[in-house]
Amino acid sequence: MSWLKEVIGTEKAVIAMCHLRALPGDPGFDTRKGMNWVIDRAHDDLMALQNGGVDAVMFSNEFSLPYLTKVRPETTAAMARIIGQLMSEIRVPFGVNVLWDPVASFDLAMATDAKFIREIFTGAYASDFGVWDTNVGETIRHQHRIGADHVKTLFNIVPEAAVYLGNRDVCSIAKSTVFNNNPDALCVSGLTAGARTDSAILKRVKETVPDTVVLANTGVCLENVEEQLCIADGCVTATTFKKDGVFANFVDQARVAKFMEKVRHIRQ
């Protein structure tokens, strides 16, 4: 039995993303609508996800485009306000993801009592937003300093919109990441949000680290969820839950319910 059963309540868990709209400081933030509009939209998406039957949710500043690797304090503060206002209505285990700043994610997790975080913890990459370096040693020491050792860590080892600077195979990355960092899960992704995770790569990673939870991190949909969950221990899902399966849209509860009905059948 993996920690998914203990923390989320089931194996083959579906972690649904609650994508927060652009926040103060982001280029896309609408100062006329303000934070109350952002909170209301997050509330609507959260309700649709929960009522549709997902196992867990993860809040992320998905519309803070283009992303920073060291976020400014207003981003974390805005996310804390949103989650704080929604707290009384959160009925499932939840995590947080401050894109792309693992230190900020740990800080937010401690402020909100989140159970897990997802981040790019390791590696060096050429990305859409420049050369992207990490410092996992400092990040995990920060986790320990603030008393966040209980927060589960989901290591994204195939970052979206980025490639590893070194010529390393994904399986060697998976193996060394597990050996050096003891992550709670590895996330395997496609190129962007909503892009399908390659099942062959997913299978190779799981075979390389069979004792570590491996999650399909992008592109899981009604048509491929059975194939993906036959390999992975669970999935992180977002775009397929939105109206017409379009990234920019809001969550469609009917799509969520149909997806989760199929997942329940797969689990049997």
List each language-model region with its residue ranges:
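Hydrophobic faces of well-ordered beta-strands that scaffold small-molecule active sites
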Residues: 14-18, 57-59, 94-96, 117-119, ...
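Conserved anion-binding
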Residues: 20-26, 104, 108-184
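N-terminal amphipathic alpha-helix/helix-capping segment at the start of soluble metabolic enzymes
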Residues: 1-35, 140, 144-145
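Alpha/beta catalytic cores of nucleotide-metabolism and tRNA/nucleoside-modifying enzymes
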Residues: 141-142, 161, 221-226, 230-268
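Catalytic cores of alpha/beta
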Residues: 96, 101-114, 172-174, 205-210, ...
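Active-site mouth loops of central-metabolism enzymes
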Residues: 19-44, 94-101, 155-171, 216-222
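Alpha-helix-loop-beta-strand connector modules within alpha/beta enzyme cores
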Residues: 10-11, 16-17, 68-96, 134-153, ...
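Glycine-rich, proline-tolerant flexible connector loops at the mouths of alpha/beta enzymes
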Residues: 53-78, 124-128, 183-196, 243-246
